[in-house]
From Swiss-Prot:
Changing E38A: No change in defense against phage PaMx41. Increased conjugation of cGAS to cellular proteins. It holds the Pfam family Prok-JAB. Belongs to the peptidase M67B family. Cap3 isopeptidase subfamily. The active site is at E38 (proton donor/acceptor). Metalloprotease priming reversal component of a CBASS antivirus system. CBASS (cyclic oligonucleotide-based antiphage signaling system) provides immunity against bacteriophages. The CD-NTase protein synthesizes cyclic nucleotides in response to infection; these serve as specific second messenger signals. The signals activate a diverse range of effectors, leading to bacterial cell death and thus abortive phage infection. A type II-A(GA) CBASS system. The keyword Zinc applies. Zn(2+) binds at H100, H102, D113. GO terms for molecular function: metal ion binding; metallopeptidase activity. SUPFAM superfamilies: JAB1/MPN domain (SSF102712). Keywords: Antiviral defense, Hydrolase, Metal-binding, Metalloprotease, Protease, Zinc. This is CD-NTase/cGAS isopeptidase.
């Protein structure tokens, strides 16, 4: 499968670009077989006006809860990486959002996904929307979720 690196919001006002290493992390955790559990982590990168460069995706840790149809990220490990990147970059690299896998070709968010995204977005200190990515077997689902109201869904840019 080939995941695209550049994406645009449905209104074309926001662009995203995923680094090669971020896309490789997604590829390594696709739920290709019936026994594969969901995986996920944080999305770290930089903000450029309304646009974002996603430079790193943390990988599941031993503390995370992973099941076929559920991933629960525990703070241990992920937050330490985010803080280290933020400190080393003097605040340039920040926590932009979260990613996780679904065992389906073309993923869509569940009700649980939506409620979790809304909760995470509402508690952000910087008041920016949360970037939410679901990695399917053949495609990505990408949405920028504000603290309240409707989010922006992204499509690949050729």
């Amino acid at each position: 499968m080939q995941f695209m690196s550049s994406w645009a919001a449905d209104d074309n006002r926001t662009l995203l670009h995923f680094s090669k290493s971020t896309l490789e992390t997604f590829r390594q955790h696709v739920q290709a077989s019936d026994s594969d559990c969901e995986a996920g982590g944080l999305l770290l990168g930089s903000v450029h006006g309304t646009h974002m460069l996603i430079e790193h995706a943390t990988v599941p840790t031993a503390w995370d809860k992973r099941f076929r149809y559920l991933f629960e990220r525990m703070p241990f490990g992920h937050e330490a990486i985010a803080l280290a990147r933020w400190t080393a970059s003097q605040g340039t690299i920040r926590h932009l959002g979260e990613w996780h896998t679904h065992p389906e070709d073309n993923p869509n968010p569940s009700g649980l996904d939506r409620s979790e995204w809304n909760r995470l977005s509402a508690k952000r200190r910087d008041k920016r929307p949360t970037l939410a990515v679901i990695v399917g077997r053949n495609a990505l689902y990408i949405e920028l979720v504000p603290g309240s109201g409707q989010g922006s869904v992204f499509s690949p840019v050729e």
